[in-house]
Amino acid sequence: QYLHRALKENKRILLEGQLGALRDLEHGIYPYTTSSSPLAGYGAVGAGIPPAAIKEVIAVTKAYSSSVGTGYFVTALAGEEAEELRKRGGDAGEYGAKTGRPRDVGWFDAIATRYGCRVQGATACAMTNIDVLGYLDEIKICVAYEIDGEQTRDFPATPRLSRAKPVYVTLPGWKTDVRGVTNYDE
């Protein structure tokens, strides 16, 4: 009743999901999925409101990639490079909140992010944790995959993903601590 009343009064309602589109049972990387849908469209179902009531979908992504558990991870880093990013990531590093298990980390994957935004129906995308990358001389962004000798910018939510190799552009890092910055002029 509360949400229906708020809708009737034209109040703003914020619904928040967890996980990401790639963990969705229908549109994610099966079998590395979850049993319930993390897609924005299911927010209406969970909240008990009409789907048409959702006017904006803001996809939220980190400036680098991370993953818990098994599954395909095209931009995964290894060794010291991964450990340094893992240590600096998030509020307490990229470690499981309850288990303390290290998460897999990697470069930003624009192909997976675009796919996730598409299946979410995102009207905007917010990027977080940019400050984490402030120690790097260079930052890589995956802009395509090479699969079986061919480049693609389409995300294959199929076993073909296991053969994907990242195609990167390399950008200069900013080598500055940007924590606490609240506007572009800073």
Which residues make up each language-model segment?
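Non-transmembrane, aqueous-exposed alpha-helical and coiled segments at domain scale
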Residues: 1-186
